[in-house]
Amino acid sequence: MRMEKIDENTIRVLLENDDLEERGITGLDLLSNHKKIERFFYSILEEVDQDHVFANNDAVTFQVLPNEQGLELLISKNLSNLDLNKAQSEMVQGKDGITEYIKDQLLKRDTASSEDDEEDDEIESYLNQADNPTKQVVLGFDTFEDWIALAQQLHIESGVSNLFVYKHQYYAQLVFFLENTTETFVQDDLAVANEFGHKTNYTADFLSEYGQRVMENSALELTRYYFKD
């Protein structure tokens, strides 16, 4: 971990993947484990703020910039009202909202992007039309590593994938758009999926209600991106 004091109100912390691993932080934690990430960020603040100048300030903000090497964390205090208003679209103040901001950054989702919204709307519209045939399967995984291994092997040509966490267990919903593929391709993909996961009685609706959806629509692609070989 490297720390640089940019000025009296801003500290930059560079955390490499090894630093995250040493602290027991995984990519999935950054997406789903609210309490763990909350503790993690404030533990970093405690490490670098030995004089407690930042920790004793109620208006501390965090800006998270993920990269392939790890994370860049900017910690700021004493922002003016103008700067604070400007920063709130880019930064997270205090504990509330930290995980949601990281999730947006890690999934490279621009919440103001109409293109992303339109794509999500198109997928939702397709799934909601009864005359659009789909095949849906939900699989459970013994470990997150099993899910990563599947993501590195399985490339769905026409469909979506969602990743859920429920009671510390990982589940994936695979949805195949049958209009744009063949039964043979679907069966081949399912054969690959069954090598790494196992069938479960849980439905996607159940997991959405009682668990947490941590990757939506492109879970396979996102996992491949963030968990490379």
Swiss-Prot record:
Subunit structure, interactors included: Homodimer.
Give the protein's biological function: Enables the recognition and targeting of unfolded and aggregated proteins to the ClpC protease or to other proteins involved in proteolysis.
Q: Which organism is it from?
A: Latilactobacillus sakei subsp. sakei (strain 23K)
Which HAMAP family does this UniProt record tie to the protein?
A: MecA (MF_01124)
Similarity annotation: Belongs to the MecA family.
Which InterPro entries did the record assign? Answer: MecA_C_sf (IPR038471), Neg-reg_MecA (IPR008681)
Q: Which Pfam family, giving just one, matches this sequence?
A: MecA
Kindly list the cysteine pairs connected by disulfide bridges: none
UniProt protein name: Adapter protein MecA
Task: Write out the transmembrane intervals.
Answer: none
Q: What is known of its domains?
A: The N-terminal domain probably binds unfolded/aggregated proteins; the C-terminal domain interacts with ClpC.
GO MF annotation: an example: protein-macromolecule adaptor activity
